[in-house]
Every structure is written in structure tokens, then in C-alpha cells.
Amino acid sequence: MIHLFVIADDFTGALDTGVQFASYGAATKVVVGTGLQALEADAQTQVLVVDAETRHLPAAQAYDTVYRLVRWAKEKKIGCIYKKTDSALRGNIGAELSAALAADGGDRLHFVPAFPNLDRVTRGGVHYIGGVPGAQSVFGKDPFEPVTHSRVEDILHEQTDTLCAYIPGGGSAEGKAGVLVYEAQTNRDMAQIADQLAARSETGLLAGCAGFASVLPRLLQLSCRDTAPLPLCGRLLAVCGSINPVSLEQCAQAEAQGAPRFSLTPEQKLSRDWAAGAQAGEMLGAVLRACSQEPVVVLDTGGAVENAGADKTADRIQIANTLGALLKRLLDDGLESTVLIMGGDCLLGLMRQLDVTEI
């Protein structure tokens, strides 16, 4: 029976939220796509996470998608609906939270955007990342959706006129309506917020990133089951489709310490047919040989593409598809390494190649 329905705006978000419950031992299912027929789960599933792929949609379309999913969950009488947001507050935050509130039919949505374990906290109404306001952080320079405001209410009001109210640490939500934005700087703060919501029986409509999601298993009293660890090969192939500076630095550090690194050129990663050709086959042969001889090998896209094209979303999808096709060829050719995929789009590209829609 589904106790919790999570709506994420991208695949990375769906996974980093789903893992909060899977690691606890709750039966968790992550589904890609918003076709309602695909959202049914077996009787053992406690947590259903859907990747709605709304991060890069126009705000109105994101609103409609979230509204429809929340209505589905209400009709199924699921006890808790969680609108997962990006921990840096990128994406259609205002449109999606207002849609969730409207579809729910209640008067309050409780939003806890902090993720203290990643040094992302909300203080005085401002969202801080690594100690600086969000718009001044690395996410203010995001090539796809830069964060342009640091005050949470300003971010919400970019896309909605729904009422917002800020709840400071230790403050009361009494008499407040709309999207309630909670201050949280520590895991203890988040646990206290969860306890307050439980005491008031207001756990039906929540929002936040994977940080607040981590307190939900206890809050919702999800049952725990034993999980066996997966056996891993001692060799590692890191496949990086992310353009996050931290990910790129990790690839550079691995190379500096002796790991063979294979980087795609802009032309290769943006081509629709290069991954299926002979030149790609030669490179993949070299990757396979390196994987059989070295403990760590890196295959990456070489960072952002300068002046790649007007349609950045199409470029992003094509790059993910190229990496997915390359990785499938490696697996088909007998790759015997543990694969670390960096970037949700990259993993989604592989899943498309394998015709897999859920995990």
C-alpha cells in the first residue's frame, strides 16, 4: 500500500529522494514519466516516486503536470504527498508548489527547502548554499536555469501569486495560509518541524528536497525491511554527463592521480549517430582495455558546450542519449566494472537505451 507519493522534477531528484526511503528499508519504487497507468504499484510498495520531468518545461505546463499528479494521489487516498524540489531551488518552484496546493484543496503546504548535510540552509527567509546566498553561489551561473533570487518567497513569486508565509526557527504557523516556508539550519531543526506537523496532523501535503525527505520514514512510521548489499566489482568506470563544476573537478582529480580519461568532443556528444559508428567503437575498445587493466577509468563529456545551439534542452537530451548509447555498447561488449554514473540525465539516457522505465 502506498503511504507516500513523491513528485520530483527530474531524475536526479527522484533518485536522491527515493534513496532516503530505500536506505531506511521502505519498499520504494521510482517511475519515469507521468502516464497515470504507469503509476500503479504492487501491494508491497510503500513509497512511490515519480520523475515528472518538469524541470525544463514552461511554468504553465509544469503546473498542469503537477496538478494532475496530485489529483491522482488524492483520488487514490494516499496519505502523504511530497513535492520534491531542487536543493538549490532551481526549476519551476513557484508554479509547482502552487499547483500542488490547488490540487490538494487545502489551505496550507509546508515547505522545508533546507538540506543541512549539503550545507544548504534557510535562514531569515534566505536560502544559503555553501554559506552564501543562493543567487551568489555556483548555481547562480547554472547554464540551464540559473538561480536569480536568494529569498525563497521571491523565487516562489516569480511564478505564482499564491500566498507565502515565512516561519522562523521556533516560530508558529498558527493562522498562516498558503505556502509556508520554514527556516531550518540543522537536521535537528528539520526533525522538530516534522514533529510539530505530526502533532497537528498536518503531514498530508509537504514539500522540500531530499533533506526533509530523510525525516519522513520516521514521521510516517514506514515499515523497515532488511536489504542485502549488492556485490560490486573492484574496478570502477566513472561515466560523467554532469557539467557541475564539482563533478568536473572530481574527473580531473581522478585523471591527475593516474586514471585513464576519455572525453568526448562537442561534435561527438551532440551527434545523433556518432555513438553507433566505427569511430566510437574504436574509442570504446580502448575504454574496455583500460577497464580490464586499471582500477579507475573515466568517460566524460568534457563539460559545457560553448555556443552549442539555441536549444539547450535539446542539446542536454542529445548528450545524455549519446552517453547512454555508449554505455549500452560497453555493457553489450562485456564490460566488467562497477559503473558510477554522474548526472541524472546520463542515467536516464542509459535507461532509454535499455527500455527501462522504473527502478
Describe each model-derived feature in a short phrase.
Residues V287-D345:
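C-terminal structural cap/anchor segments
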Residues G33-Q37, H56-W72, I319-T322:
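Glycine-rich, highly charged phosphate/nucleotide-binding loops
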